[in-house]
Regions:
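C-terminal catalytic histidine-bearing segment of alpha/beta-hydrolase fold enzymes
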Residues: 271, 277, 283-285, 297-395, ...
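Gly/Ser-rich "nucleophile elbow"/oxyanion-hole loop immediately N-terminal to the catalytic nucleophile
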Residues: 139-144, 190-226, 240
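A domain-start/cap signature at the N-terminus of enzymes
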Residues: 34-146, 445-478
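Primarily recognizes the serine-hydrolase "nucleophile elbow" in alpha/beta-hydrolase
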Residues: 218-264
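Active-site-adjacent alpha-helix of alpha/beta-hydrolase-fold enzymes
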Residues: 272-310, 399-419, 425-433
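Catalytic His-Asp charge-relay segment
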Residues: 265-273
Length: 478
């Protein structure tokens, strides 16, 4: 009997071990199944939201200009240790939803020297008969994630300007890199890179390029020449939270069209001929230089003690409208975006009647005004301080020939009646400690935040950016 008991003990231990292994396996398989089911649920939400947005864009210009925000009903708290895993799941669901969406896809990049042509049809409701041909190609080694340059051409005959863009893109010393070189869809009054149909194209480009996975999301650059200089200056300010750097050339916008504060945290190059007097390009470039220099003096460092306004703005001596174009992209390529600045300056303005709904980690749920709102956010030691102002412009200089408003004064008053969502992550705050939010000098929030799936989904929908799948947020009425 004693020998039998000794024999039975290892057998019982073996059976217990097998049982434990099977139980753990069942738990693991169940967790995996639950994860797969949740990813499918999130993907279906993303796909339905993308289809809804697509229908809105096709329906009317007014609907596109409203630029509504979307909020999911999917809710689930997440432990801090599981944040990265869930962010990965959400981005995978976003990838799958974009892949399944029925739309014209971004062409696969080939060698830029081949000049392979592709095209997108832009929504008829935004611009009639708008077909945007483009080159999308790679320079140098295609290994790993590459920087992406968006080049905007000038306002000559569009076929000629587009062909010149391909020549320049191949010539510039910035490889290895990817280039997206579009042709303006229509000439005349639609020969503007900042109009709503083109906004549709830029947001589609960024969304699809970041999903494809061969683009470095922190190394996106926009630049252009002449009309493309005007366009890239506007896009630099409007979409600054996506760019690592921007480089208009031979342009010059009145700064009401491209507020310099938005270009905090990015590199900004602006080169114009000193004798380029057409439409006051040299004067307006000089005014931009003064504005950047003044902004740098007023706010030299961000909350992390890094330079806030890194810029190179030069009037090139002895040059008119044609300048040295090769100087810009090598300078731009030195910059890498910080997707999580603790100092955010944002003048929320309309471009062709359309406002952005978010910028960096801010999302506007309800604007305090139909006009302009200025947000000044600083994060330090888990305290989020935001000053929100309404902005009024008064022209103080106009040209006598065309009536172009050249210079402005701005006045600010405290904004009231808005609702703002502030997305946060461990790069911006300590997720284990209470967070305080102060708006216009008044404390609006003081408590701990919790990571959750809803904020990850909402922020992914808003920004379509792999670096901005935020695990938590705070909503503030003011």
């Amino acid at each position: 009997m004693k020998g039998q008991r000794q024999t039975m003990k290892p057998i019982k231990n073996f059976i217990a071990a097998v049982g434990l292994t099977l139980a753990l396996s069942a738990i693991t398989n169940n967790a995996h199944a639950q994860g797969s089911n949740m990813q499918e649920k999130v993907k279906n939400y993303f796909l339905q939201t993308l289809k809804t947005k697509q229908n809105e864009e096709q329906k009317s210009k007014d609907a596109f200009q409203r630029n509504k925000t979307y909020t999911t009903d999917i809710q689930q708290l997440i432990k801090n240790k599981d944040i990265a895993q869930n962010q990965k799941m959400v981005w995978a669901a976003w990838y799958e939803a974009n892949r399944e969406l029925n739309e014209q896809k971004l062409a696969k990049p080939e060698d830029l020297r081949k000049g392979v042509k592709s095209a997108w049809n832009l929504p008829e409701a935004l611009e009639k008969n708008a077909v945007m041909p483009y080159y999308y190609g790679v320079k140098g080694s295609a290994v790993g994630k590459l920087p992406l340059f968006l080049y905007l051409h000038g306002s000559g005959p569009k076929e000629h300007e587009w062909a010149t863009g391909l020549i320049l893109g191949n010539r510039f010393q910035d490889g290895p890199s990817l280039y997206f070189i579009p042709q303006i869809p229509n000439e005349g009054d639609y020969y503007r890179w900042w109009q709503v149909a083109k906004q549709f194209a830029w947001e589609k480009l960024i969304r699809q390029a970041l999903v494809e996975g061969n683009v470095d999301a922190n190394r996106l650059y926009v630049f252009g020449i002449s009309e493309g200089g005007y366009g890239s200056q506007r896009l630099a300010s409007f979409y600054a939270d996506y760019w690592a750097a921007a480089g208009p050339m031979a342009g010059g916008e009145p700064l009401k069209n491209a507020p310099v504060e938005n270009c905090a945290n990015i590199g900004f190059s602006f080169l114009t001929g000193a004798d380029d007097t057409g439409f006051y390009r040299n004067i307006l470039t000089y005014y931009t230089q003064i504005a950047f220099d003044s902004a740098q003096l007023a706010r030299p460092l961000d909350a992390n003690k890094h330079p806030l306004f890194v810029h190179r703005i030069n009037l090139l001596p002895g040059m008119q409208h044609h300048i040295k174009y090769d100087l810009t992209t090598p300078w731009l390529k030195n910059f890498v975006r910080n997707p999580y600045p603790k100092t955010v300056l944002w003048e929320d303005y309309d471009m062709d009647g359309r406002h952005r709904s978010g910028f960096y980690n801010l999302q506007v749920l309800s604007s305090p005004t139909k006009n302009r709102t200025y947000y000044d956010m600083n994060i330090h030691n888990n305290v989020v301080t935001i000053n929100i102002k309404e902005v009024e412009y008064t022209a103080v200089e106009r040209d006598k020939h065309w009536g172009i408003e050249m210079r402005f004064n701005r006045s600010y008053t405290d904004a009231k009646g808005g609702r703002l969502r502030i997305y946060l992550n461990s790069e911006l705050i300590d997720m284990n400690k209470p967070v305080t939010v102060i708006v216009n000098g008044k404390e609006r929030y003081r408590k701990n935040v919790k990571a959750n799936l809803q904020d990850m989904i909402n922020s992914c929908t808003e920004y379509f950016d792999p670096y901005r799948v935020y695990p938590t947020s705070i909503e503030i009425n003011y």
